[in-house]
């Protein structure tokens, strides 16, 4: 460990050697992605931190990592001995990077360097405004250095390029030409002629195309320019891309030439500053005056979040088939561990993936399995390692958070299960987290209600006993796309986006006790119309997840009748849907679990 700490200390020293007052290293890629290819894992290369969300700032006298509540424990462990300080976000006392930089320097001018390929236009504008307020015009200099770390990172990976998979209307429920026609109509309504798209999930949805350039996410690294006449897809290895009607393929590296050649065709251009990287924006500005660019949230974000009939059918199928694999896994785990078989967290994770991979249409996991026993489950995004993986023992709690990518849908399920004797505290936490999940599941609410307005339903049982969790309660899920998508969310942070029929969102409260245990229950919900009255339209949720809830350690007096009835009814449905999909011994086991 000391040797690894020295590696990261050396890398921080190399970054300081670039000669800037501050260097910002962002945890994203040129497309604003949450998950990205190894080439852009710059924060991990420089610091050793492997969490999905984190930004690094290196000054001549300080190195700091900014990350949120999901990763505090992990960051403390991985940063130990590196000299890098943890800066906590999504807490009341947070000081984000722009404000921290604005208060850190005593002398001017301040030279701040960043990789403009991995900083959004919106982020750079916020940074510019904040530093101007602190140091005044001329008191600072923002320096865009594309691929800033390449001179230091000798074996930096190349940009990947995987085979292209075009999907047809039978799979997606809507043809590519119809999606493009809709987008062009949207642009007209916004006073624009064209749109430049950078977000990989939006491009994948719009073009009905998938790939595997990024682990767990079926994307092709690319840009897309949609004009009134054409859709130009900028992608690597153009010669290997199968033809698709209505799509012109161009090389990923000739974006500047294409913008110049098609300037007149584009007219007024719409871009989303939250995902467009700053360096690409500068290229666009070479050919478009500021008055010829319209900023706004991409209309694709909301449109793809509202699933069509075919997509909803696919999700239902995915959760049933994945549920059968998960039940088979839980049967194997319980019988193996209680039977004295040596099973590690890694082996359990591999077993889950092996069972899921037997499903027709499987394209990979939708994220890295979280296979966590005991105290390891207190890290919400814990990932076990093949070497020295902890042994799962026949006592306490085990947590599995797992999902799959299928051509007909994407899944994400968490189950915490007892493997033997559990403490009173474990049983209380288990029951109260389940109580919160059920209370949100049973919600009926008026149309126009945002996720932040119903988040407290999942937290109320925890708050009542002075418990809480730091992450959001729910995130959107894409259709054979990313397991995390917006615009909706269920979390305490303000998000005005209403929940709408057709949205598919997770419901995953939890409790995490460092050094002891972690509990999370997660089902995925389909928002639907419940009915109408003189007070308007009301909405509710349908549960898509199909995996039983273990009731053996519930403290039933902590649940009311409606909650107990829900558990019984849910488990009955799970058994009915899965019994004929399971091996006889697994079906027999599940029947007992669902009583």
Predicted regions and their residues:
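Active-site neighborhoods and metal-handling regions in enzymes and metal-associated proteins
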Residues: 1-595
